[in-house]
Swiss-Prot record:
Compartments (UniProt record): Virion tegument; Host nucleus matrix
Organism taxonomic ancestry: Viruses, Duplodnaviria, Heunggongvirae, Peploviricota, Herviviricetes
GO annotation, biological process: viral life cycle
Name of this protein: Tegument protein UL55 homolog
Pfam families with a match to the protein in the record: Herpes_UL55 (PF04537)
Species name: Gallid herpesvirus 2 (strain Chicken/Md5/ATCC VR-987)
One annotated Gene Ontology cellular component of this protein: host cell nuclear matrix
Keywords: Host nucleus, Virion, Virion tegument
Annotated family: Belongs to the alphaherpesvirinae HHV-1 UL55 family.
Keyword DNA-binding tagged: no
Amino acid sequence: MAAGAMSSSTLAQIPNVYQVIDPLAIDTSSTSTKRLLDEPVPHIGSITSRSYLLRVKCSSPEDCHAFFFGLATEASGNMSQHGAEYIARSMNEKLYTGRSADELCHTPFSHATILDSLDDNYTLNIEGLCYHCHCENKFSHECWKAAFIAGEKMALLCKDLRMYCH
């Protein structure tokens, strides 16, 4: 089995994704990319106490900004962590094919989690994907366009997984 490949029984355990939710902009430019690997990034513009775990695996020293895409599954199911990790890895592998070695970022996709602390005793975790970029004009028209294209590609991959793996 190729690196990053999963067995058909493991693929069957990934919940069906029926919709990739439109991107949510996350301004991380004041945070180093290294810190984005496993530390929650707080979000101050939210009604609840919200933070993001973006798990960016980029080796670029440049600041980045990100978009969170929720993955809507069946009403009775939730996206699993290994499912989101698999989808992110697959997206990066598809993107890497045909790219030159000197391009800025080879891993713009990662498994991400929204952490909503609804009260002291309960945190809601929403699993999804992060798409990050290093463009100079963060959240410009071109940047948003790239994010929506990324979302469309995620939706196509999720459709393929639904059709051929379940």
